[in-house]
């Protein structure tokens, strides 16, 4: 089962997506990031999608949703 690691580095969560992000994995990632933000209360969340070859409209919406959730929970979000 594929998973996207969420690493805590100081006051920042780093999410580095290095696998093909299919719909089910993207939805699971949204929940995992929300849980990690609630648990660690980071100042920022860095989402690295440089390893993703194709970002379709669904994946784009899920990434936007993840960013919106993190911002609502008080974290700044950077997508690279």
Residue ranges of predicted features:
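Amphipathic alpha-helical interaction surfaces in cytosolic regulatory modules
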Residues: 39-43, 47-80
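Conserved alpha-helical scaffold flanking the Walker A/P-loop in AAA+ ATPase domains
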Residues: 34-37
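STAS-typified acidic loop motif
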Residues: 2-31
């Amino acid at each position: 089962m594929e998973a996207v690691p969420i690493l805590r580095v100081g006051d920042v969560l780093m999410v580095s997506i290095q696998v093909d992000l299919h719909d089910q994995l993207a939805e699971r990632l949204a929940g995992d990031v929300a849980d990690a933000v609630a648990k660690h209360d980071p100042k920022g969340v860095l989402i690295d999608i440089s390893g993703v070859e194709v970002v379709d409209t669904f994946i784009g919406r899920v990434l936007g949703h993840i960013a919106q959730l993190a911002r609502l929970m008080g974290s700044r979000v950077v997508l690279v």
